[in-house]
Amino acid sequence: MEQDLIVSLGQRALEMTLLLALPVLLSTFVVGLVVSIFQAATQIQEMTLSYIPKVITAFLVIFLLGGWMMRKLVDFAVEIFANIPVWIR
């Protein structure tokens, strides 16, 4: 395998990882920010108040977008495995 091919595969794998992780990370970030602003405004310093909404949000996003995420991941894996014979030559 050539160096360019390996770098390209690594780059595409990182892009896929970012694409699949971004919805969960972004939604939990927004919920955490909103809860933190609420806690600062009301002076409530309960740790579980910030943790539980983020976990619920992450599960909800995975539940709603899980099919799309799996489809993207399977398509990527199928493409990788289908091209292995071409890359070996």
UniProtKB/Swiss-Prot annotation:
Coiled coil ranges? none
Instruction: List GO BP terms, alphabetically.
Output: bacterial-type flagellum assembly; protein secretion
Where are the bilayer-spanning segments?
Answer: 18-38, 49-69
The way it spans or sits in the membrane comes to: Multi-pass membrane protein
Alphabetically ordered keywords of this record: Bacterial flagellum, Cell membrane, Membrane, Transmembrane, Transmembrane helix
Localization per Swiss-Prot or TrEMBL: Cell membrane; Bacterial flagellum basal body
Which Pfam families does this one have? Bac_export_3 (PF01313)
Give the CC-aspect GO terms.
bacterial-type flagellum basal body; plasma membrane
Looking up NCBIfam families in the UniProt record yields: fliQ
Q: What does this protein do?
A: Role in flagellar biosynthesis.
* Family the UniProt entry places it in: Belongs to the FliQ/MopD/SpaQ family.
Q: What is this protein called?
A: Flagellar biosynthetic protein FliQ
